[in-house]
From Swiss-Prot:
The keyword Repeat applies. Induction: Expression is repressed by the zinc cluster transcription factor acuM in order to stimulate expression of genes involved in both reductive iron assimilation and siderophore-mediated iron uptake. Residues 496-505 have a biased composition (Pro residues). It comes from Aspergillus fumigatus (strain ATCC MYA-4609 / CBS 101355 / FGSC A1100 / Af293) (Neosartorya fumigata). GATA-type transcription repressor that regulates iron- acquisition genes through specific binding the GATA sequence element 5'-ATCWGATAA-3' of target promoters. Iron acquisition regulation is critical for survival under both iron-limiting conditions (to acquire essential iron) and iron-replete conditions (to limit iron toxicity). SreA targets include genes encoding a number of key iron-regulated factors such as those involved in siderophore biosynthesis. This is GATA-type transcription factor sreA. The conserved cystein-rich region (CRR) localized between the zinc fingers is also involved in DNA-binding and transcription repressor activity. Residues 1-101, 138-174, 217-242, 301-332, 371-531 are annotated as: Disordered. Gene3D superfamilies: Erythroid Transcription Factor GATA-1, subunit A (3.30.50.10). Disruption phenotype: During iron-replete conditions, partially derepresses synthesis of triacetylfusarinine C (TAFC) and uptake of iron resulting in increased cellular accumulation of both iron and ferricrocin (FC). Increases sensitivity to iron and oxidative stress.
Amino acid sequence: MLASVPQMDSVRSLPRNHDVVARHASAEDLDAAQQLISSAQAGREHTTDRHRDEKVTAPVRHQMKTSMNGQRWPEQQRTAPPAEKTSTSPKAQKDTSFLGHSCSNCGTKSTPLWRRSPTGAMICNACGLYLKARNVARPTKRNRMEPGSEAGGQQTGHGIAQSESASQGHCQSNSGGGSCPGGGNCNGTGGAEGCDGCPAYNNRVYKSAARGTVPIHSWRATNSGSDRPLAETENDAGKNGATVEGGNMLVSCQNCGTTVTPLWRRDENGHPICNACGLYYKLHGCYRPTTMKKSIIKRRKRVVPALRDQSPSGATYSSNGSSASPEASPAVLAHSHDDHYRYLSSDPTLQANHQRHYAVAPPPVDFTHFSATGSLSLPHHPPPPRLLEPERLSAPSHSPIPQFGRRSISPSTSGSAKKRTLAETTSSTDTASVPTTLESGSNQLPPIISTANPSPPGRLSSISTLLNHSGPHDESRLDPSLAALSRQQQHHKATPLPPHPPSQPLPGVSELESLKEDRRAKLQREAEEMREMLRAKERELAELGA
């Protein structure tokens, strides 16, 4: 009975709440958590969180030791709830802040990707990308704050709520009554239909919202100066370089001093500059002159508002925008084409290039029946008729001239594998009609061209066919429009060539001798007749003189 008493005491000493048992961590879990915390603290520069972690883990270790000893459990059970609350809340905070990481540059505790700076410090993804791209630390809000602003930043919850309400009212007043004309010409004040997506207007709204942490009395002090026009504000900003309102520094361009821009850029020294100055420096390699500064920002009309046709401002600035929108009217596009041609007419060099670019293409050739006819024919250079006659092509070639040409104009219809050129075909047809005495190797030369022995018209006919257009047989293989064009050109010729005599075969040597004898006899007879006529004239003169 006495032996069972300690067992009953140990059973009574167990907690009746099962949730409390589940919340107690084992020694292995505590060691793993301690290793994670120590590894996370290795890259941190701040030592305050390390002391807080030691204070947090000390009650947990003390609770683990006392839970293993059953004698002090009732007292520990009464003091456990406060320790559990203090131990579980930092753990949840550690999980949400990714094991206690914080950016050494901006101080944030949440980021999609943690990075390391060149010095080994832990930085967030935004600061890491900025440092990698510009080799300069990313400017943060705490870097822009003045040293005296830390004391002014410690306000009560009531003061913060009043400043936020004042900043919201200031933003609404700016967005409600703006003087922006719209249509691509923006001054950042809002009030037009397309200002909701304007980067300059959104930038101004963001800047006014960022100054919401200023106390309410500072708004009363600077409220009179905020009603001035935009041009005066930008001029003051250009003179001073930066406008300080209640401890916050308003970003302004280092070059021209403007505070309204669609995109803030940085120069080679890391100073903020506006989009216009940044693009000018990127293109020209020098700073943008301050005389080029304008009070109105002209932006691209990428998104056309739905009520653009009904607004007078959209109709006013639609024609002189910086870029044409896809929904531009045909009249605007026609006007741009007229300007383009007018510009081309002013410069003769560009006009010549433009006309050369839009030159008329040559007429197409119909190759539909090329394989059927076996010859290539163009409208301007038709083949000679001797190449199209099969009896000419089938004649055997006995030309002693070596055949050097390999390119062919018309393939042979006799079915031979070798293709002949124009020179080969002409030489073969000419040598085919030479007498057999020359072929046998005689020493006689071919006859001299004379009136009695005209030249063979074979080559002349081929040249004439090249100069003249082809007949109806060749035109039947071409496109009807091309055939009509060739007939029209043939009709407009001023002096047609005289018709050539039909081709005749060359006479032989014996025939030439007979022709010479006949010619000699004919000339002798004509001479005798002329002598007889001369004697008759002399007799008449003698009779008249007697």
